[in-house]
Amino acid sequence: EEIIATKTGNDFVTFEIKNVAPIAVAKKYAGIGASLVARIRNTKTPFGIDFGVGDVIVPKQEKRKIPTQLDDFEAPTVNTYSLETTVAEKLDAILSLMEFSSRMKDYYDLYYLANKFDFNGATLTEALKKTFENRGHKFTVEQFEQVMAFGSDDAMQKKWKAFCRKIDTKTDDYGTVLKT
């Protein structure tokens, strides 16, 4: 509440906290998830923010400007995970859940990041190693191969197509996304 009450000089947008709850309760890592609604006059935009607790960040946290959709507003700067740690955490989630994952967003985010940013291989490898260790996971080559095989899995293809319709994107087919 203190954060969203901070004076910014922006009187047009208001925020309401809908829910705050622990995330990843059953896992060996934790955090807090907040569901909010932003309002500009009669327009409501729901969104969520996850606050990680106890995560390993490689090489270090980053300050990142979040672009706004309205030209007259200053882009806020927030502390974020490094992109390498973001990739590692998403890959960890995919490998942990395998075909039970309904989070096509993780696949999309990895695809987007791989196409938008250049990564240092050594730094990314270190982020993967430390994230997997921190979460108590050891993955095999066979698990990676199984994820790649999802490209020809009808159920996963169906989930991917539904996700793409939901976010209104013309992103490549699921098999291409997996190869990226």
Each language-model region and where it sits:
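Structured mid-to-C-terminal alpha-helical surface segments
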Residues: E1-T180
